[in-house]
Amino acid sequence: DCIEFEKTIEILKTLTSAAIDMKLGAILEDEIVDQMPKWFNSNSRSHKILIQSTLGGTKTIELICKKFKVEFTLLGEEEKLVNGISEVVWNHTTLHMRSRDKNWTYLQMLLPLNNELELISFLRKKWGRKVLWHLEAVSQQGSPRLAALPVLRWNGINELNEIMEDCKKLGAFIFNPHVLTVEGGGLGVVDADQVKAKLKFDPK
């Protein structure tokens, strides 16, 4: 649990560079946490840093949390839990939000390296609570990076495009889930293998 959103990013980046076998790393902004299932958000209203690692990594995670003066909670072994954190990350986050309000949608993006907070701060100032932040630790060519699956309040295609342009100008690489074409989804080019897969799996 962390009161300051800016600190959550610093903590997650510290964890991704530590000697931890980390299977999952994510951040959920407090207003997203409020919309998650009761088993997850009943203890406190704060931003959450979610980490899934091998048992050997838990001590290092706890020490890093102590260094940053944030509360550390060990949930236990994932396969033994009735509810695990994998149920509130990845696309599950948006699905939980949309189950309460269909006006929420989302984007996917790779955040600019070392300028993640600059982008988020700009969008928070301009768009306020229309954009809520869900971040995930990813690996790009072997290097730790932060990706975002922000949850957006839908207010039409023009506003969506403006938000995406703001992100691009600040260095984010957008994967737009609202388009039907392969080239519109992020790569910007037509990839033959992706087109074949799209023809195979798209509804007929």
Regions found by a protein language model. Give the residues of each.
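C-terminal substrate-binding/cap subdomain adjacent to the FAD-binding core in PCMH-type
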Residues: 1-90
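Conserved glycine-rich FAD pyrophosphate-binding loop
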Residues: 30-31, 41-43, 65-204
